[in-house]
Amino acid sequence: AVAADRVDEILTSETAIEDRKTPEKLGENGKGEVEFHHVSFRYPGAEEDVLHDISFTAEPGKTTAFIGSTGCGKSTLVNLIPRFYDVTDGKITIDGKDVRDVSQHELREKLGYVPQKAVLFSGDIASNILYGNPDGSEAEMIEAATIAQATEFIDTKPEKYKSPISQGGSNVSGGQKQRLSIARAIAKHPQVFIFDDSFSALDYKTDVTLRRALAEKTSGSTVLIVAQRISTILHAEQILSLIHISEPTRLRR
């Protein structure tokens, strides 16, 4: 009975993030300019903001990178863009539209998001790469894998792109998971790329080669990168440092 009550509670509870009853459209002619307008955020029940009065513009064709100490809110900041959370104050816009006014589905269709912890699904390599673009061609899949430096290990497997992937990617290494996650984002052809410390499991040589190829592929897109390694973001046109000194995190340019 207790279990049944819990299931009923989950099924009848409202989701924390909801779409407007009549959401607006981002439109087909947008370029993916992301702008934070005096954004503050605090977790539900918390007494202090994690992020406070953050303002910046990430322009198409340019890379905006975020650095800062562990726990300063870098991942929280980029997770506000796809609306994993909603801002407490201020607003985030893409091409001038408040992300809260757009349906979550349409918003996320414009984004290529690679999380800190790479996520793979049970299936094969091909289905994982084309997950965000199920109608994508074999050529698109191979191009994405090549840019992500994933062909290096895919080509050694007897079944190549049909090689099975266990749930969570438990049968591939951490670096291989990251490369497949990056390939999946590339194959989607998004306007906005978000890399949340997505290169940490790569060796230095692979990291450098991947970033060079990625820079060419994403030259017309808006790219946001959260990084621990300074070397990962030296090419960025805009580097923003998040500082946390016994007060909510703020931006330092």
Locate the predicted segments by residue.
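Cytosolic ends of transmembrane helices, especially the final helix of ABC transmembrane type-1 domains
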Residues: 1-10
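ABC-type nucleotide-binding domain
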Residues: 12, 19-20, 27-242, 246, ...
